[in-house]
Amino acid sequence: MAVFHAFRALRPTPEKTDLYDERVYEKAKENLDNMEEKGILVQDQKACYYIYELVRKGKTQTGIVGCSSIDDYMNGVVKKHELTREDKEQDRIHHVDSCNANTGPIFLACRYPDSLLTLMNNWKDHHEAAYDFTEEDQITHRVWVIDEDEVISEINKEFAGIDFLYIADGHHRAASAVKVGLKRREQNPGYTGEEEFNYFLSVVFPYDQLCILPYNRIVKDLNGLTVKAFLGALKFNFELMLMPGFPCKPVEKHCMGMYVDGQWYHLKAWPDIYEKKDVVGQLDVSILQEKVLRPVLGIEDPRTDQR
C-alpha cells in the first residue's frame, strides 16, 4: 500500500521574479527565506493535492503532486532502479538539511486506476488552473489545486490501493530527503510519523504517459588506449557502425550511440554477451557497465570514479 499525503505547498505568485562551499548552501537558504518574506512563495492555508500537467511537442503528461512516506522508500513500496553517486547524494543532503525543504519533487510513476484518472480529469474540467504558462523551452506547465476535503480523502484511498511506486527520476533527491528525514527522527525521538520530515515531495504520473529520455555517460579519457585500440576492444561485444555527420540516438534495446574522437558510432550488443534470463544484466545500462566501462575503461564504480 502506497502512503501518499496532501501538503501545504509554498507556491510562487504569478509574477516572475567552489559548488560545495558552505556559503552555497547558506545562500540557498537565504534565497528561500527571501522568497517567502517577499510573498513570491506563499504557503497554502491547508494541506492540498495538486494536479501537475506538462505539454511538450504535443504530448501531455498529467500527475498528482503530494508527499511520499520515507518508510515506503525504506520498505520497498517506492521502487528504486539505480545506484546513487556519493558526492551528489551528500550535496543534496546538505542542501535539503540547510533549506529545511524539498526544493524539487521526486518523479514517480505507477499504474493509475481508471477511477483516479477520472477524478483528475473531472477536477480539471470543472476548475480553473492556478498556473498556466509556457516556458522558453516550449514546455507548457499547468497546476490545479485540489483543496476539497472529500476529494482529498478519495485520493488518499486511491493511493492506498496502489501497491508500488517507481522512481522515474530523482534517485539522489529521494535518497537525500530520506536521510535527512532519518536525521530529524534521531533529533526528535518522540516523533509520531506525521511530521513533515517523514515525507518527501513527489509527483506521481501514470506510467503509460511517460516519455523516456536519454541518460548519457561522459568519460574523461580512454584509460590509456588509442582510439583504434578502444574501438577494437568494443568489437568483441558490439557491432560497430560509423554514423558520420549527426548524433546517433538508439531506437531499440541493446543499442547505444557513442561519440569519440569527433565521430559518432552506433553500437549494437551481440546477443550472446548477456543472459536472457537475467532481468538486470540485460539492461542497456548494465551492458554498458559490464562490457565497456569496467573491462575496457577501468571504471569499477561509476558512483565514485572521478573520470
Cite the ranges covered by each PLM segment:
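Surface-exposed, charge/polar-rich loops and edge strands
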Residues: 1-307
